[in-house]
Amino acid sequence: MLFLRLLPLILCFSGLVHAEHRVFTRKDGFLSMRDKLNVYFFRSDTHRLLVRDEGSVKTPRYGSLDKAMRKSPCVAGVNGGFFSADAEGTPLGLVVQDGKRLSPLATGSFAVSGVVYEGGRDGLTLVRSSVLRRMRRLPAMQAAIQGGPFLVENGSAVKGLNAQKSTYRTFIATDGGRRWCIGVSSSLTLKELAAWLAAPGALGNFRVATALNLDGGSSSAFWCHETGISYPAFKQVRNYLGVAPVERR
């Protein structure tokens, strides 16, 4: 009986769990507020990314992350990339949904410094936008979202990140191999979040090699089917990034 209760924990620390939701907290000082991360871990050999685009923020196709995920084969999801303040909420940067490019690759802003994409031969990949910009032709993509800035690169927190503005944050990260996670944070500066993600043991046995910031603030949203948790955005966003099991043929 005790073994059955401990089995999920044993599997977690042995690295056999393919996907799970976990919450991490910390306090910097006795009088400080408790910081929190809601994180969904998954493996790129058992799960894939899906993009769900609203089409317009004025007349959205879904209306919320929760509805978008429930109408898809997703087990977890977060809000996606940045978008403009016009009536349609035009995406800022590359958006690919089900193999169709909805918005082109953008450059010249920290908000579009990186791209996470689900490709055919390449699998799940997180790269700098400049790498794709130098290509004569973009690789095949089934799903893609552009965001920024990078929070962690080569296992270290990126230097020069904003240390003044605190707000909710959304991110995607990888250990450099097949282990990935999506997550949202409580109100933090970019510098604080980067330092937290890069700290050894911050996400248990998941060591962050690269992490990319997505749209945050009032756009931040998190949804997990397994635990029934749904943290909606405070405003209508343009697109979402979901995690779904790989389709076996």
Predicted features along the sequence, with ranges:
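Repetitive helical segments and hydrophobic/amphipathic motifs
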Residues: 11-14
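Gly/Ser/Thr/Pro-rich low-complexity, intrinsically disordered segments
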Residues: 16-249
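Sec-dependent signal peptide recognition
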Residues: 1-9
